[in-house]
Design a protein with these regions (language model features):
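Aromatic-lined carbohydrate-binding/catalytic grooves of carbohydrate-active enzymes
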Residues: 70-106
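Catalytic domains of carbohydrate-active enzymes, especially glycoside hydrolases
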Residues: 57-84, 186-189, 288, 294
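Aromatic- and acidic-residue-enriched segments that line the glycan-binding/catalytic groove
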Residues: 84-99, 134-160, 196-219, 264-275
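Pro/Thr/Ser/Gly-rich low-complexity, intrinsically disordered linker/stalk tracts
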Residues: 382-438, 495-507
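Active-site-adjacent "subsite" loops/lids of carbohydrate-active enzymes
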Residues: 33, 41, 45-53, 57, ...
Length: 507
């Protein structure tokens, strides 16, 4: 009997501990401001062979599932090799869309425009992702006659089965900037995103043939490596300025390789790693761009596991947190590697909890981008379910970028409830504001029960983030006799949030 009493007591204490841990987890991960992105790539061929309807259905399904998992921003690849998944006067249609470079989709559609519309309907941002310098991947056998490397072969060089637009030629850089300005000016994108491809990744036995360009365009720089870095620096600054001159609210983001420099290369600030380096191998001086404000956000690709011998995840997230905090810092996360790597303390679970904990401990980390979206929607290793039920259980707004604009729009107007045969709908009118900096583009709807403090900093009270000027109350939320308060705020282009306006209803 005594043993049973002790057993029950232990069981009770265990349940209390588990309950406390669960409450602690939800409290810990309830950030109202958090960039929760996912990359949707085409270069892997996942859409090749699909009809227009099949691809749209596939993307719509992915977006629905990603929203359920808490994702609030999509980074969609639209230019993998100087081609286009959108209508372009500069570049041919992508073979990763239609199977043949230069061939338009049939039935005709514009994937970028469609994705912008679909993301905005779901309250998500859409960032157009381009590969700036890569002109041909290894698997592409034929380029269209309208491709830049065919029309102007002098602007590109061959390297390890690829074609690369030469960063050392001003006309090549200008061409990419013109392509970006065309995208930003014609499409309602929330961001323009480039990845880690600048100068090509080093390959054994390969040489970048740019002696002639170095001789012609060195601008007094005597060291070729410094000159190459300067070429990329000039490009990044030029691109940043072009984007913000075209549309000041469009965010410019970069997702570089995860190591800036190893300690052996830079004793002062190098990380305790031994992998390939942005600065030395790709000629990408990420910290210069961040510190000079030439990017709006940086997403280092930390695709390794905690405990990796050459590139330890924990070492690197702490390094980036320390040195790259002058602009928004998000972490590029490899979903599959995370769930396949056992936790170092408890090998019966994967590394997702440990990595999430590290994210929350870093004061400069303001978000995550998941590589890649399909791994989340396929729920590999239960990753998507854990986001939905634990880490991203409640919705989040993307972080503010006060260095672009920090002024919030005015309150919404004329809130009212109307009853229809199929339910009750809350309507409101947008606040007055015509300029991009004060015009409302989205709204946040919160719900509070009678007697509850109105606290819009609590994301668990968010019931919708929408571009509509109405919210239909679900039948499950209507309980006769109960009184609820609905609160609506307005968001501008940069997710600055207005003061709340509330309206009560008794069912």
């Amino acid at each position: 009997m005594k043993k049973n009493v002790i057993s029950y007591r232990r069981l009770f204490l265990t349940l209390i501990v588990l309950l406390s841990a669960t409450v602690s987890v939800f409290a810990q991960y309830s950030n109202k401001r958090d960039f929760r992105g996912a990359w949707i790539q085409c270069v892997n061929g996942q859409f090749m062979g699909m009809s227009t309807k099949q691809m749209q259905d596939t993307l719509a399904s992915q977006l629905d599932r990603l929203k359920e998992c808490g994702v609030n921003a999509i980074i969609f690849q639209v230019r993998p090799e100087c081609d286009a998944l959108y209508v372009s006067k500069y570049e041919p249609w992508s073979r990763f869309l239609t199977g043949v470079q230069g061939k338009a989709p049939y039935p005709f559609w514009d994937p970028l425009n469609w994705m912008i519309d679909q993301c905005h309907k779901r309250g998500m941002e859409l960032h157009a992702w381009i590969n700036p310098f890569r002109a041909k991947t290894k698997t592409t056998n034929q380029l269209a006659s309208t491709h830049i490397a065919i029309k102007h072969p002098e602007l590109a060089f061959a390297y390890d089965g690829q074609m690369i637009l030469n960063p050392g030629i001003p006309e090549a850089r200008d061409y990419i900037v013109d392509v970006v300005k065309d995208i930003v000016s014609r499409y309602d994108v929330d961001g323009l995103h480039i990845d880690d491809y600048f100068y090509p990744y080093p390959a054994p036995g390969q040489t970048i043939r740019d002696d002639a360009e170095f001789a012609k365009y060195n601008n007094g720089i005597k060291n070729k490596n410094d000159w190459r870095r300067d070429n990329v620096n000039v490009f990044i600054k030029q691109l940043y300025e072009a984007i913000h001159e075209t549309k000041p609210w469009v965010k410019f983001g970069i997702s570089p390789f995860g190591i800036y420099r190893n300690k052996k290369s830079d004793q002062l600030i190098g990380s305790k790693t031994s992998g390939l380096q942005n600065y030395d191998d790709l000629y990408a001086d990420i910290l210069m761009w961040v510190n000079n404000g030439w990017v709006d956000y940086c997403v280092p690709q930390l695709y390794w596991e905690i405990g990796h011998k050459a590139a330890d995840y924990e070492t690197l997230i702490k390094w980036w947190n320390k040195y790259a905090g002058k602009r928004h810092l998000y972490i590029g996360e490899d979903v599959i590697r995370t769930v396949k790597s056992p936790d170092l303390v408890n090998r019966s679970i994967n590394q997702m909890p440990a990595k999430q904990k590290l994210h929350r401990e870093m004061n400069n980390v303001q978000g995550t981008v998941l590589w890649y979206a399909k791994a989340v929607t396929d729920n590999v290793g239960n990753y998507g379910s854990m986001l939905k039920n634990v880490y991203w259980k409640y919705p989040a707004l993307v972080p503010q970028m006060k260095y672009i604009d920090g002024k919030a729009p005015k309150k919404v107007r004329k809130m009212k409830f109307l009853a229809f045969e199929d339910g009750i709908v809350l309507f409101w009118k947008s606040p007055k504001g015509k300029d991009w900096s004060n015009k409302a583009v989205k709204y946040v709807v919160y719900k509070f029960v009678k007697g509850e403090k109105i606290n819009i900093d609590d994301p668990s009270k968010i019931v919708a983030i929408t571009s509509d000027e109405f919210y239909k109350i679900p039948a499950s939320a209507i309980k006769p006799g109960e009184k609820h308060y609905y609160v609506v705020t307005a968001l501008d282009r940069l997710s600055n949030e207005s003061k709340p306006r509330k309206k009560s209803i008794r069912y």
